[in-house]
């Protein structure tokens, strides 16, 4: 521990970090496995198990997923005052209760309450873990620390969705949240036994009111807010892995499809490439690296849309695949590559803006781009699904013939055109951002 501290204080880049860093990353893996296991199934769960329409499910998913990125404005300040360890214990208790509620009480009245518990628990986890990463690294090693953190996030994401597929196939989509509840309990046990971070006792944390006042000052920084909104375009498309893709695939390919595993291509690509890409772009400014990501993300949506132009199965490496499968996987892989250029540099930039003792609050603000993206992307998804890729149960209830039902899906791929347009607008916005004077983000 002392050797690690000396290395950090030396100002030289290092891959060695204190125990709290590694323990925090371990529980982050379990939390992400729990979250993404349920998140990949949520859109289908809300319609097929709970009975909501596509539009209602889209709005519920939008409010749930976006609130996880809004609540840290409050929970970040609370975690700084309560301490990171008590905050994390509270977080995993809320998560276990929330996921358990989804599994045992899947009704339209109870599900929103259970999702609120999950959102509150997740909102505590985010600022605590990212704050721990920031406190456990110095300026010379911070990019490495966040690249390792982001790798663990994606390993957890990969694991959660990998397990969700057999759970859905063998026990039904309604049982997926039960798996997430067990993962949250495992994270709670690890936190209780092993997570003892060094608190910044010499710094007096702000109150919630003071933190919100500080947030108002930050929000008046037009350039940083513009960067938040521009990068939200990236995450609005990325969010369709959970909002649109599962229903799109299951409705066009059939129940034997594996949207959970298709979505896993994204974290697999990130795990394999995030460290080398971080090394590759280390001399680029944050805006230049983000620009590469925003150039790739609309292309990924266009690749997904090409399924509407292919007829019949595709033979690839000796296997016969549905064209939707081939193009979904290709587009998702491209999204993973784009994410490697965006996320580590973006988090690095945001963490460098944090004042002493306030990493939790400021890192919560850094994720505000995902708040806007999830709120917009999930809500839009519900309307696009209803228009171009409707629920087959709704069509059957209308008494449509087989031919009429097939015609209802003829333009399903138009959904991806809409999100390609969102990505293009984000890219053009970044170009304008880079050309305007006063580029503080390059510092």
Across the structure, where does each feature detected by a protein language model lie?
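C-terminal ends and interior cores of transmembrane alpha-helices
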Residues: 93-107, 295-320
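Helix-to-loop junctions at the C-terminal end of transmembrane segments
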Residues: 71-84, 168, 272-292
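Symmetry-related core transmembrane helices of the 12-TM Major Facilitator Superfamily/SLC fold
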Residues: 174-193, 409-432
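Glycine-rich segments within core transmembrane alpha-helices of 12-TM secondary carriers
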Residues: 143-168, 183-184, 366-381
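Juxtamembrane intracellular "pre-TM" segments in multi-pass secondary transporters
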Residues: 2-18, 201-228
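Conserved MFS/SLC helix-loop-helix module at the cytosolic interface between two early adjacent transmembrane helices
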Residues: 70-106
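Short amphipathic helix-loop junctions that connect adjacent transmembrane helices
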Residues: 40-56, 243-260
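Intracellular juxtamembrane helix-capping segments at the cytosolic ends
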Residues: 124-138, 249, 341-355
């Amino acid at each position: 521990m002392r050797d690690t501290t000396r290395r950090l204080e030396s100002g030289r880049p290092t891959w060695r970090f204190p125990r709290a860093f590694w323990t925090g990353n371990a529980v982050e893996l379990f939390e992400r496995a729990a979250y993404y296991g349920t998140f990949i199934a949520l859109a289908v769960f809300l319609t097929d198990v709970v009975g909501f329409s596509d539009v209602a499910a889209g709005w519920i998913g939008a409010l749930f997923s976006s609130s996880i990125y809004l609540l840290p404005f409050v929970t970040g300040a609370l975690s700084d005052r309560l301490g990171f360890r008590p905050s994390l214990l509270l977080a995993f208790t809320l998560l276990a209760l929330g996921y358990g509620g989804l599994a045992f009480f899947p009704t339209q009245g109870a599900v929103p309450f259970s999702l609120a518990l999950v959102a509150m628990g997740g909102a505590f986890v985010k600022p605590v873990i990212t704050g721990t990463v920031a406190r456990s690294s110095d300026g010379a090693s911070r990019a490495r620390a966040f690249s390792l953190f982001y790798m663990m996030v994606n390993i957890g994401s990969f694991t959660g969705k990998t397990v969700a597929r057999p759970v859905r196939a063998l026990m039904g989509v309604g049982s997926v949240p039960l798996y997430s509840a067990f993962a949250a309990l495992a994270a709670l046990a690890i936190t209780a036994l092993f997570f003892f971070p060094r608190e910044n006792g010499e710094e007096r944390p702000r109150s919630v009111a003071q933190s919100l006042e500080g947030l108002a000052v930050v929000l008046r920084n037009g350039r940083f807010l513009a960067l938040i909104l521009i990068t939200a375009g990236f995450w609005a498309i990325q969010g369709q892995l959970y909002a649109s893709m599962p229903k799109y695939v299951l409705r066009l390919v059939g129940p034997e499809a594996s949207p959970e595993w298709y979505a896993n291509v994204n974290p697999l690509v990130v795990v394999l490439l995030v460290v080398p890409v971080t090394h590759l772009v280390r001399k680029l400014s944050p805006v230049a690296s983000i620009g590469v990501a925003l150039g790739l993300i609309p292309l990924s949506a266009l690749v997904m849309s090409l399924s509407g132009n292919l007829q019949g199965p595709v033979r690839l490496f000796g296997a016969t695949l549905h064209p939707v499968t081939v193009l979904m996987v290709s587009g998702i892989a491209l999204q993973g590559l784009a994410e490697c250029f965006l996320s580590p540099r973006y988090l690095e930039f945001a963490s460098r803006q944090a004042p002493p003792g306030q990493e939790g609050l400021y890192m919560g603000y850094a994720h505000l781009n995902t708040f806007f993206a999830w709120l917009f992307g999930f809500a839009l998804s519900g309307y696009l699904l209803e228009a171009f890729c409707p629920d087959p149960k709704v069509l059957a209830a209308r008494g449509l013939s087989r031919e009429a039902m097939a015609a209802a899906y003829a333009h399903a791929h138009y959904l991806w055109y809409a999100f390609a347009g969102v990505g293009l607008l984000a890219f053009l916005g970044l170009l304008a951002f880079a050309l305007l004077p006063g580029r503080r983000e390059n510092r």
